[in-house]
Amino acid sequence: MNTQEPVSGTKDAKLHILCAGVSLMLVRMLKDQWDALHPELPAAVKPAGSVDLIRLCIAGEPCDVLISADDAILRDMMMPQYAEGYHIWAGNKIVVVGEGIGTENWEEKLLAPDATFKHHNPFGDPGGYRAVMAMLLADEYKPGLSERLLYHPGHIGMEKNPPPGSQREAQYEFTYYSGAKASGKSFAELPAVMDLSDTKLADVYARVCFAVDDENTVTATPIAHALTIPKTAVHQEAAKEFAGMFLALDKEAAGFLPRASVVGRDPLR
């Protein structure tokens, strides 16, 4: 495929990839391969929380491929004005990472009076609002547990606009299974009714939601990571090639759960 598309007024054309942190390891690996194949159009990778990435794309940030941690926000924030469809490329689940924590003792560890636990910013990152959703769903597992987790004095991460690098360290962290597996650290798997992994529990998950801003409230769904090519992509054909290479990667080997489908118009066609 010829990716040498003319770009008026620029001598250093790049393929701009905006990617969620959960996909960064895969994207970095693919960038090296892409750059070797296409030195005329190297990939410029920008990682961030998916809500923030979508806001950047809508505001005019160069974006040829957008890889989101959550398909729902692509649908709700970008379609149909900024994108016509997307590929779901993997599933995942929420777990808790930390020294000595496991599936048998996570309640005890997190509810200890001196425990501290954190997550990403829920107002900009699906990993953050999914952690909050997991806590909200804790009542489905054990009534009263949601409030004890959400309002625990050691719960860190609910500040809306924290200064960069200001978040305190914590003993435990709510994160994705794929990231936990890659880290090599101890982690606890949560009950399926909390971990947002089971498509059969979609109706249960949908009982909770989170407002990321005044205009967008996200309803909990089984985790689906997704990829789109915005209408504003400058390098449309190259974006399709990069996206196809990404979709062909072995995501299960990287700790992701198998899940794949197309919603709306296939951006690769």
Question: PLM features: residue spans?
Answer:
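Exported/periplasmic ABC-transporter solute-binding proteins
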Residues: 1-37, 42, 51, 58, ...
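Short beta-strand->alpha-helix junction loop in the catalytic core
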Residues: 93
